[in-house]
A protein has these predicted regions:
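Loop-to-transmembrane-helix transition segments
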Residues: 7-15, 62-89, 133, 156-164, ...
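Hydrophobic transmembrane alpha-helices of multi-pass small-molecule transport proteins
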Residues: 51, 125-147, 164, 280, ...
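Hydrophobic/aromatic residues within transmembrane alpha-helices
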Residues: 29, 39, 43, 93, ...
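Specific transmembrane alpha-helical segments of multi-pass solute transporters/efflux pumps
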Residues: 18-23, 56-101, 105-106, 142, ...
């Protein structure tokens, strides 16, 4: 193992742990009286602010902002606005679904992406997408089958978590298409437009700003404007944890790790996120999964690995990862 790989792998693990922290912190935040809309409003507002500070303190990133093509800017704004559906459904689901179970179910998204790619994007060869889908469905069935009926979360919450996975999968397909990937380019060199545009930190800051703006408008529309006075004092440290650890730290460590080991390997290593959520949920929230649910989680992870390790045709993009979005 070379030095870059040795440094990159721990960074991706730290990133996965950071993202997992956001799921686990949601429950104690909700316990203070803060609901999902308020949580995501502040998460993306403060996250976008930190993102712009990170851009502006670096002359290289400032230069990338100035050079950012207009099309890339519009794409980032559009994707940021669309991302509200994924984040909103997931955190709304976490109001009633335990973080451990939600973390397992939502991680079916790489498999959904692989299947959707058969029709809407650069398809993966062979039967792997269908094998992965079968494993993911079986894993989800086991995860749900092990739920204690006496303490089962409402079906609405489970549907919200699944909706989050589906919306994020569609979002990834759209992001690839808007960035220039063409389904009819299969087997040929990737078009120039599909290459990374601008600095990743700049793109993320723009996207998070768009997401924050949509949530701010949504809050005004339902009579819930951003008002710090409405946040209980005990919720602020937890909100800070979501912003600093689950957003800023997770994003930056993923970028740093992916630059060292590549997005494909980073995507594979990121599959440690659901197990981390399960462990953190047990340690800090006392949440546990039944043995049959753990078996289901294992099947889902195997499905993700099958989808992520499928050989890609020449010119096909690397597997979708959190590099393309703030999650």
């Amino acid at each position: 193992m070379d030095r870059r790989t040795a440094a990159g792998i721990p960074l991706i693990v730290v990133s996965a742990a950071g993202y997992a922290t956001g799921s686990v912190l949601a429950a104690p935040i909700y316990a203070t009286g803060v609901d999902w809309l308020t949580l995501v409003q502040w998460r993306f507002l403060v996250g976008a602010t930190l993102g712009w500070i990170w851009v502006l303190v670096s002359s290289e990133r400032r230069a990338s902002l100035v050079r950012m093509p207009r099309r890339a800017l519009l794409v980032a704004l559009a994707l940021g606005a669309l991302f509200t559906g994924n984040a909103g459904t997931y955190y709304a689901g976490l109001e009633t679904v335990p973080a451990a179970l939600a973390g397992v179910l939502v991680y079916t998204y790489p498999v959904i992406v692989a299947v959707l790619s058969l029709r809407f994007a650069t398809r993966l060869p062979g039967r792997r997408p269908w094998i992965a889908l079968g494993l993911a469905v079986a894993g989800s069935a086991l995860a749900l089958g092990g739920i204690d009926v006496a303490t089962a979360p409402p079906i609405e919450g489970l549907l919200l978590v699944w909706a989050s996975a589906l919306i994020y999968s569609v979002w990834i397909i759209l992001s690839a298409r808007l960035s220039g990937e063409r389904r009819d380019r299969l087997g040929s060199d990737a078009p120039e437009a599909a290459q990374p545009v601008g600095d990743a930190a700049v793109t993320t800051a723009v996207m998070m700003s768009a997401t924050a703006s949509v949530y701010a408008v949504a809050g005004l529309a339902v009579g819930r404007p951003l008002d710090p006075a409405r946040i209980p004092a005990e919720a602020w440290p937890l909100l800070a944890g979501v912003v600093l650890v689950a957003s800023f730290l997770a994003i930056q460590t993923f970028y740093a790790g992916a630059r060292r080991i590549g997005a494909a390997r980073a995507a594979l290593i990121s599959t440690v996120e659901p197990p981390i959520i399960v462990v953190l949920s047990f340690v800090f929230l006392g949440q546990t999964l039944a043995p049959i649910q753990l078996a289901g989680a294992a099947l889902i992870l195997i499905a993700v690995i099958v989808a992520q390790t499928s050989p890609r045709p020449k010119g096909a993009p690397e597997p979708a990862t959190p590099l393309e979005a703030e999650v």
